[in-house]
């Protein structure tokens, strides 16, 4: 890592990646000490200001690395050279903070394994827009690929330098809409790699004077963007445990999602 700084990052409910940067030299101390964080950061919105809350935030937290090593990526032509470290938030006693999204995923996966002797494998497909592109219906078209080929090439090269594998990077249904598809992985690794891939995409776009957005709706007249989650249930020996009855249950849950959750 020749860049002098490494950024310790978390992803929050606003969809932003946030964190703090420290010198690369001595950054191994983060594994033990972490960095200071505050509960009030949970109220930060995607637009910057904090949301209004009834009660004041109290106490302190620690931002610590979730893995032993940071991820480095580079692009010589764009003069990109970055070191990013996926993190998680813990309380001062070292236990996971209740609002840490990565810790929530870890807890859910442990519950699935311990209570039901099951594990998940997921494949993620993330759609995004490059705004300002031609106003044409370009579903999977060659024209849409060629129009953004310089960006897609740079994006792919940065992903490759970061060690992030992907299945495809192609035009989608909307004008200026594209999709990044990742291979099937352990859910925790898949989530980490998706967050890194999104951040890398934004950084590449900024260096090329493009505007990339993962917003679900960018216009009242174009199709929206989403994240597709393809998953399979397995027992602890890796045998498939998807079933017809299970599929019916999942289908019912999907149809009733509006009544059991809010976003």
What are these regions (language model features)?
Residues 120-132, 162-182, 212-228:
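Core alpha/beta catalytic barrel or barrel-like domain that forms the active/cofactor pocket
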Residues 85-91, 178-185, 231:
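Short, hydrophobic beta-strand segments
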Residues 184-197, 217-220:
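Active-site neighborhood of thiol-dependent amide/isopeptide-bond enzymes
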Residues 1-171, 193:
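ATP/Mg2+-dependent ligation/transfer catalytic cores
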Residues 254-263:
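Single conserved hydrophobic/aromatic residue that forms the stacking wall/gate
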Residues 95-99, 189-190, 239-242:
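Short, conserved charged micro-motifs
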Residues 198-255:
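Glycine-rich anion/phosphate-binding loop at the beta-strand->alpha-helix junction
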């Amino acid at each position: 890592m020749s860049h002098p700084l490494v950024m310790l990052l978390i992803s929050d409910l606003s969809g932003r990646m946030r964190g703090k940067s420290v010198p690369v030299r001595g950054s191994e101390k983060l594994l033990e000490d972490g960095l200071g964080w505050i509960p009030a950061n949970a109220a930060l919105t995607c637009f910057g200001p904090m949301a209004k809350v009834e009660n004041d935030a109290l106490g302190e937290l620690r931002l610590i690395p979730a893995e032993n090593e940071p991820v480095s990526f580079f692009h010589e032509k764009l003069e990109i050279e970055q070191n990013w470290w996926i993190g998680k938030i813990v309380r001062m006693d070292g236990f996971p903070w209740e609002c840490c999204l990565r810790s929530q995923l870890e807890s859910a996966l442990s519950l699935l394994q311990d209570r039901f002797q099951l594990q998940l494998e997921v494949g993620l497909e993330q759609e995004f827009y490059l705004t300002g592109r031609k106003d044409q219906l370009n579903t999977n078209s060659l024209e849409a690929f060629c129009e953004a080929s310089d960006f897609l090439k740079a994006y792919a090269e940065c992903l490759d330098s970061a060690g992030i594998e992907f299945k495809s990077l192609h035009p989608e249904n909307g004008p200026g809409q594209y999709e990044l598809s990742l291979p099937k992985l352990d859910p925790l690794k898949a989530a980490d790699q998706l967050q890194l891939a999104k951040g890398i995409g934004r950084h590449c776009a900024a260096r090329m004077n493009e505007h990339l957005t993962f917003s679900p709706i960018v216009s009242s007249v174009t199709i929206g963007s989403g994240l597709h989650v393809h998953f399979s249930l397995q027992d602890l020996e890796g045998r498939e445990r998807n079933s017809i009855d299970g599929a019916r249950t999942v289908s019912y849950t999907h149809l009733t999602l509006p009544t059991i959750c809010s976003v």
